[in-house]
Every structure is written in C-alpha cells, then in structure tokens.
C-alpha cells in the first residue's frame, strides 16, 4: 500500500473524556478510521504520519444511532474506531482547541 492510501486510512482523532484519559495514562490514542482498514494498515499509517512506534492496535465497529429527522426516523452511518497504544518513549501531540 502506498503512502497516500495509508494517510487516508486515518480520518480523525476521537476526542472525548475517555480517550484523553487513556492518552495521558497509557499512551493510548483513539482514531476514527476507514471501515475497510485493517490493524496492520492502521499501525503503518500512525507510524508514517506521526513518526512513532506502535505497540498494539485494537479496532471496533461502532453502530450508528437511530435519530429523528423531522417526522421521520433515520439511521446514522456505522463507523470504525481504532485504539492505538504506543511503545514507551513515544508520544503524539494532538492540538485540541
């Protein structure tokens, strides 16, 4: 897989109270990734984009919620989330404003 496709694997970091606590304590970061991405692709993308060494990757599929759109019920899209743990001595600085 070339570098451009790897860079498109990661969509965005997931910023929440749980993900921020994991980043501070365990060097564990959470990303929203493409639904077809594998663990190896996610690991390669993080190492390429941030210049760090990845210890482990855990992925899960998040089911979309049912939401009301006016008088109709709709469904949000399903998406994939990846928990990436870094090796000791490495860190990612995510600027959150």
UniProtKB/Swiss-Prot annotation:
The keyword Ligase does not apply. Gene3D superfamilies: 3.30.70.330. Keywords: Ribonucleoprotein, Ribosomal protein, RNA-binding, rRNA-binding. GO terms for cellular component: ribonucleoprotein complex; ribosome. One of its GO terms (molecular function) is rRNA binding. It comes from the Bacteria. InterPro entries: Nucleotide-bd_a/b_plait_sf, Ribosomal_uL23-like, Ribosomal_uL23/eL15/eS24_sf. Pfam families: Ribosomal_L23. SUPFAM superfamilies: Ribosomal proteins S24e, L23 and L15e. GO terms for biological process: translation. Disulfide bonds: none annotated. One of the early assembly proteins it binds 23S rRNA. One of the proteins that surrounds the polypeptide exit tunnel on the outside of the ribosome. Forms the main docking site for trigger factor binding to the ribosome. Belongs to the universal ribosomal protein uL23 family. Part of the 50S ribosomal subunit. Contacts protein L29, and trigger factor when it is bound to the ribosome. This is Large ribosomal subunit protein uL23. It comes from Methylococcus capsulatus (strain ATCC 33009 / NCIMB 11132 / Bath). The lineage of its organism: Bacteria, Pseudomonadati, Pseudomonadota, Gammaproteobacteria, Methylococcales. The gene is rplW.
């Amino acid at each position: 897989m070339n570098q451009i496709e790897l860079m498109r694997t990661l969509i965005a970091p997931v910023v929440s109270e749980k993900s921020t606590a994991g980043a501070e304590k365990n060097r564990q970061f959470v990303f929203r990734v493409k639904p077809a991405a594998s663990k190896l692709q996610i690991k390669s993308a993080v190492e390429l984009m941030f210049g760090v060494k990845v210890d482990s990757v855990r992925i899960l599929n998040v089911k979309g919620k049912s939401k009301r759109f006016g008088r109709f019920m709709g469904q949000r899209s399903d998406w994939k989330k990846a928990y990436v743990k870094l090796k000791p001595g490495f860190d990612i600085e995510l600027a959150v404003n």
